[in-house]
Amino acid sequence: MLVSDAMTKEPVTCPADTPLRDAVALFRKNHIGGLPVMEGRELVGMVTESDLIALLESERISDDLWLPSPFEIIEIPIREFINWEKTKHALTNIGDMPVKKIMTHHVVTATEEMEVEAAAALMLKEGITRLPVLRGKTIVGIITRADIINAIGASYSGKDGAE
């Protein structure tokens, strides 16, 4: 079975300057976990739920955060105050950050003519869950682990292709 038989055609994509809050809205609206990131018609990256979780993890406030008493406040070095302000600002403005700041730049892709088994093996090898499908440099679909499972299940039940 070919990738073209199992892929989702016309995948949801987003421009590289899309704010993260809009990307998250696209994830939720379309029940997806990743978006191909485009500059014009060119695929330039991939942003996934994992990228967002990693960002939140890196922006987390330390568990050993020390909050001074009013008497100790005078003794806090000014650099600690500046770092705290930067952290608060970063946490407040994550939603405004463009996806290009956190996306994966090296995108592993598939072609329509690739066998589904080869696409599955590539996903396993690369530790990813979806592959944009390209025809030349144009994105024509996306294939996910769920698409592969659906296609295999459909072939076993006598149906043709994914639903």
Please place each PLM-identified region on the residue numbering:
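Tandem CBS (Cystathionine beta-synthase) repeat/Bateman regulatory domains
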Residues: M1-E163
